[in-house]
Design a protein with these regions (language model features):
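Binuclear metal-dependent hydrolase catalytic cores
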Residues: 1-179, 184-186, 259-289, 297-305
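Cap/insert and terminal regions of metallo-dependent hydrolase folds
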Residues: 162, 171-173, 179-278
């Protein structure tokens, strides 16, 4: 089994941010010597650097779908890495439409890019980024690293994909945004880590009550996202090593704490469980990690098992 590190850079579902609250969705994965970012919601650039990683080390980026809380800061991340000295190409994988996003970004920043090439002698950012649009099936096979995609149920978005990363016997699966979707259990079968989105229904009701478009928002949330107990059901059916709740809805309700998430999930999942929070680090150091249930804290936001 490979050693790996997962850093939850942003754990909030939805694009809005509030004072003192968490950031939208992005995750750093270090696996098989590769530096991988999954989704690029607002705050991803600072999140990567706060995780102790140089932006010059960016290698692979994957976007699960084109909702803004998953893609808004992709361009800024790449541009900032470029100004920080990025000198090697970066591959960006995502659904149909991602290349249009990227071309629009570099067109909007054309003045800055051109003048930095001339004035600072930088390589051309536009030639350093390769955008690869994908559908279901194999996305990448590079040495011992493979990535596959499964189209999930996130209406009205049709191009939304769960991702499975595998390297030398280790498997990490991201649910992406999805309603309860039974085929995801087969896709995540035997994974060491399943990062699955989650909602708490009582929190949704309070969220809806304080928004101007409450009825429409509730309809969208209930049709397009998974309740915490449903995430537990997928984890149980898949037989994963650990369930990590991510993309939390709501993530910034002061009346909801970690115990509420745990209570909801324990109705369907009795295995190892981590409730996501910004900056949390999951580290695997040895070969028996899948069978360990007793993660222990090694810092303010690190969970490590061996």
């Amino acid at each position: 089994m490979s050693k790996y590190r997962i850093v939850l850079l942003g754990t909030k579902g939805g694009p809005a941010i509030r004072p003192g609250g968490p950031w939208p969705t992005s995750t750093l994965v270090e696996l098989g010597g590769r530096t991988i970012v999954v989704d690029c919601g607002l705050g991803v650039t600072r999140g990567v650097t706060d995780a102790g990683l140089s932006l010059k080390a960016l290698d692979l980026i994957f976007i699960t779908h084109l909702h803004s809380d998953h893609v808004l800061e992709l361009g800024a991340l790449l541009h900032t890495a470029w100004t920080a000295g990025l000198a090697t190409p970066v591959k960006v994988f995502g659904p149909a439409g991602l290349n249009r996003y990227w071309q629009g970004f570099v067109q909007a920043l054309e003045f800055d890019i051109e003048i930095r090439i001339i004035d600072e002698g930088r390589p051309d950012l536009r030639e350093m980024v390769e955008v690869v649009e994908f559908g279901e099936g194999e996305v990448l096979r590079d040495g011992d690293l493979s990535v596959t995609a499964l189209r999930v149920d996130h209406p009205p978005v049709t191009e939304c994909f769960a991702l499975r990363f595998e390297h030398q016997g280790t498997a990490i699966v991201f649910s992406a945004d999805t309603a309860f979707f039974p085929p995801l259990a087969d896709f995540a079968r035997g994974a060491d880590i399943l990062l699955h989105e989650a909602m708490l229904e009582e929190g949704v009701e309070r969220l809806v009550a304080r928004t101007g478009n409450g009825a429409r928002l509730r309809e969208h949330l209930m049709a397009s996202h998974s309740l915490a107990g449903e995430a537990g059901t997928i984890a149980a059916r898949a037989g994963v090593g650990r369930l990590v709740l991510n993309h939390l809805i709501p993530a910034d309700d002061p009346e909801i704490g970690e115990a509420d998430w745990v209570e909801a999930v324990r109705k369907t999942w009795n295995g190892p469980l981590t409730i996501g929070r910004d900056g949390l680090v999951v580290v695997v150091e040895g070969d028996d990690a899948r069978n360990r249930e007793d993660l222990h804290e090694t810092g303010d936001a690190e969970e490590r098992f061996a």
